[in-house]
Swiss-Prot record:
Gene name of this polypeptide: rpsG
InterPro entries in the record: Ribosomal_uS7, Ribosomal_uS7_bac/org-type, Ribosomal_uS7_CS, Ribosomal_uS7_dom, Ribosomal_uS7_dom_sf
Keyword annotations from UniProtKB, A to Z: Ribonucleoprotein, Ribosomal protein, RNA-binding, rRNA-binding, tRNA-binding
Organism superkingdom: Bacteria
GO MF term set: rRNA binding; structural constituent of ribosome; tRNA binding
Protein name: Small ribosomal subunit protein uS7
Subunit structure: Part of the 30S ribosomal subunit. Contacts proteins S9 and S11.
Length: 157
């Protein structure tokens, strides 16, 4: 165990257009090589596409519903007990839930078949808000894994 003190969480500023901290976090996950302006254009472009495709809901509501649909409630963590390694199901902390949801959405969007990242991201957010798509499947697989290993839940720490 580390003897140093725990690292402080960095505070991020809300994004300029919507004033939302989670959009800024999402932007930072999309960003490559410190090019924040490029990431900003990708995200705001995707939000424009979402606004055109979903008239009933705003892009920010669609984004938040997509995040909620992808966020896992439970995951498995490896625990070594007497020479055997067990996959122990544990609840996911709220900050990790959001981080995993964002990471899975961005990864799923990057693997999609559309031409530009803006289109890929808009498509994945739209799918996730409708409870389908690769990112939602990832969450379902995580939950299935946890359910399959429920017998080892008494090894929780």
């Amino acid at each position: 165990m580390s003897r140093r003190r725990r690292a402080e969480k960095r505070q991020v500023l809300p994004d300029p257009k919507f004033g939302d901290l989670i959009v800024t976090k999402f932007m930072n996950y999309v960003m490559y090589e410190g090019k924040k302006a490029v990431a900003e254009n990708i995200i705001y472009g995707a939000f424009d596409i979402l606004e055109n495709k979903r008239k009933d809901q705003g892009p920010l509501e669609t984004f938040h519903s997509a995040l909620d649909n992808v966020a896992p409630a439970i995951e498995v963590r490896s625990r070594r007990v007497g020479g055997a390694t067990y996959q122990v199901p544990v609840e996911v902390r709220p900050d990790r839930r959001r981080a995993l949801a964002i990471r899975w959405l961005v990864t799923a969007a990057r693997k999609r078949g559309e031409n530009t990242m803006t289109e890929k991201l808009a498509g994945e957010l739209l799918d996730a808000s409708n409870n389908r798509g690769t990112a939602v499947k990832k969450r379902e697989d995580t939950h299935k894994m946890a359910e399959a290993n429920r017998a080892f839940s008494h090894y929780r720490w």
